[in-house]
C-alpha cells in the first residue's frame, strides 16, 4: 500500500478558465476540485475508476452500488487566483457502514485558502435502497485512518 501522503495529499494548479471576471476562482469550481481530488486519491490508492463510477470506458460490469452526494459545503478563507499552486489535503471519514464524507483543505504556501466537504451515501444501483459501502471504498477509508487517532 502506498504512503497516505501519496494519495491523501494532492496538488492542483489553478487555470485561468476556472476564474471569474474578477480573476478569482468561481465558487462552483471548488466542488469540482473536491470530486476530482477524490477520484485521483482513489486511483493513486489503486482503485480503478470502473470499480466505482458507472460509464467508464471498457467497463466489464456496472457497479452494483452507487455513491451519490447527499451533502456538500464549501468555504473560501482567502481569494484563489489563476496560477496558484494549491495543495489539497483529503480527510476521509466513515460515518456509518453505508455513508462516508471527505473533508478537503486547500492550501497555498501552507495557508488554508478554502475548505470543502462532500458526503456520500451507498445505495444499490437497481433498487436505490441504502446498503453497505463497496469493499474498495471500505478499504480506502480504513487505510486513511492508519496513524490517525479517532475520537472515542
Curated annotation (Swiss-Prot):
It catalyses: 1,4-dihydroxy-2-naphthoyl-CoA + H2O = 1,4-dihydroxy-2-naphthoate + CoA + H(+). InterPro entries: DHNA_CoA_hydrolase, HotDog_dom_sf. GO terms for biological process: phylloquinone biosynthetic process. Keywords: Hydrolase. It comes from the Bacteria. It is an enzyme of class 3 (hydrolase). CDD domains: 4HBT (cd00586). The keyword Nucleotidyltransferase does not apply. Its EC number is 3.1.2.28. Pfam families: 4HBT_2. The active site is at 20. Pathway: Cofactor biosynthesis; phylloquinone biosynthesis; Quinol/quinone metabolism; 1,4-dihydroxy-2-naphthoate biosynthesis; 1,4-dihydroxy-2-naphthoate from chorismate: step 7/7. GO terms for molecular function: 1,4-dihydroxy-2-naphthoyl-CoA thioesterase activity. Catalyzes the hydrolysis of 1,4-dihydroxy-2-naphthoyl-CoA (DHNA-CoA) to 1,4-dihydroxy-2-naphthoate (DHNA), a reaction involved in phylloquinone (vitamin K1) biosynthesis. Belongs to the 4-hydroxybenzoyl-CoA thioesterase family. DHNA-CoA hydrolase subfamily. HAMAP family: DHNA_CoA_hydrolase. This is 1,4-dihydroxy-2-naphthoyl-CoA hydrolase. It comes from Synechococcus sp. (strain CC9311).
